[in-house]
Design a protein with these regions (language model features):
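N-terminal amphipathic/basic leader segments beginning at the initiator methionine
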Residues: 2-18
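Active-site-proximal beta-alpha core segment in soluble small-molecule metabolic enzymes
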Residues: 12-13, 19, 23-27, 31-34, ...
Length: 152
């Protein structure tokens, strides 16, 4: 498998405050693949989700997604449906899940692209309506606040 020599350009890079040093991090895709394979060995037949939200934390969602899937990740996780739709447009056909939705989230497009959805109670009606309109089956992961004050 070949990998780009340069990390992908981040989606947004705020300018440095005068006097600050610009920071960067580089992902070694071979090391990432090694780590995913090792995790799969440790967890056996359990599913492994590789979270690549926010453009893989600015490292390039597409190359990180390809490497994670090639090494055995079962599912890719992103925050927003638009991130998942971009991965589909880029040719990633692996299972994808998005879990943070806004009133403008395009659930119809998500269902048509077979994107799994992490949903709370208030998302269920919108997802069910989108499934009815598209004729697509929605695969949902229910989110619950377990006391941390977070919904996930």
């Amino acid at each position: 498998m070949t990998h780009p020599q340069q990390p992908a350009e981040p989606l947004y890079c705020p300018p440095c405050t005068p006097g600050q040093v610009e920071r960067s991090a580089t992902i070694d895709l071979d090391a990432l693949e090694h780590n995913v394979r090792r995790l799969k060995e440790l967890i056996g037949d359990r599913a492994l989700i590789a979270v690549i939200k926010a453009d893989a934390y600015g490292h390039g969602a597409y190359p990180v997604a390809r490497s994670a899937i090639a090494a055995g990740a079962d599912l890719l996780g992103v925050v927003h449906v638009n991130e998942a739709l971009q991965l589909r447009a880029d040719g990633i056909d692996a299972p994808l899940m998005a879990w943070l939705h806004t009133p403008s989230t395009d659930f119809e497009a998500a269902l048509q692209e077979k994107i799994r959805l992490g949903v709370s109670g208030w998302d269920l009606e919108a997802v069910a309506a989108a499934a009815e309109r598209t004729g697509e089956r929605a695969i949902v992961h229910l989110k619950a606040d377990t006391g941390l004050g977070r919904n996930g």
